[in-house]
Amino acid sequence: MRKGYLKPKFLKHDYNYSSKQKTSNICICSIGKNENLYVREFVEYYFNLGIDKIFIYDNNDINGEKFENVLMDFIQNNFVEIIDVRGLSSIQIPIYNYCYRKYNKFYDWIGFLDFDEFLFIENNKTIKNYIYDEKFNKCQMIFFNWILYNDNDQVKYENRSLLERFSKPTMNYTQGKSFVRGKLDNLIIPSSHIPGINIYNFFFFFLDIIYPSDFFGNKFEKDPKAFIKHFYTKTAEEFCNKINKGHAHFHRNHSDYKSSIKNRINLFFSLNKKTKEKVNILEKCLITKIN
């Protein structure tokens, strides 16, 4: 259990859930642009994991692709709901906050995930078998570390699932994503990773956060209970497409935009073997010189 700075009195809801409770509703909030090649695998995966609902905020260009073209069956059975935020930029954090405020009263847990993030739970447990364990009874948030996967020496997209194409974990990362308890007052989400609580305009992390594996990524190999398989780069070709979609947090004319591209390229080659072919693909696509 990781302790923060708040006292329980700041939280209106003092949770003490039983694993045998009758209600068990878990949803995911996601936002995406140009993700039709990947979104169906994501939806099918979490359907099988036991998620009850996925809210997808459609951030495609006004005349761009539509999630409905690949998810209509899941939309019709009410597992997926598409919310139109097309044509807007750098809105991931506002959308996460909006989604929590709108839906937190209806769900016990809300997860905030991208379409390249797949929650793995050992022993093939469903998320409900896992998240309603008594060890989480008084927990307001569960943080799952990323394990980053490399490109398996592939350079271009193939019409196969991410889980099939990329099977080599390469880095235990200190970052990750969270599932947050519903019905929390004053919750704010300042980043895509860890929400917190706003008390008199001061931001605090949660009092009780559980990390199934070590926060600094040191126990993954010994204790792989639950973590997120994060296919951050995929291939060089797909990584270019990812960068060209724009940044989740600031506009293209922001002073930090160019440096963010450089940092992302550096991360790409820290995860993947640097080859002339990959460098050429990135330089041509991103119109930048790579040393």
Regions found by a protein language model. Give the residues of each.
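Catalytic-site signature of metal-activated, phosphate-bearing donor transferases
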Residues: 1-11, 93-94, 121-291
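Conserved short acidic donor-positioning loop in nucleotide-sugar-dependent glycosyltransferases
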Residues: 59-62, 118
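Divalent cation-coordinating acidic motifs and surrounding scaffolds
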Residues: 106-114, 127, 139
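Active-site-proximal specificity loops/subdomain of glycosyltransferases
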Residues: 63-112, 121
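N-proximal low-complexity "stem/linker" segments adjacent to membrane-targeting elements
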Residues: 1-44
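Short, acidic, metal-binding catalytic loop of nucleotide-sugar glycosyltransferases
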Residues: 44-53
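Short hydrophobic alpha-helical runs that function as membrane-insertion/retention elements
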Residues: 53-58, 81-82
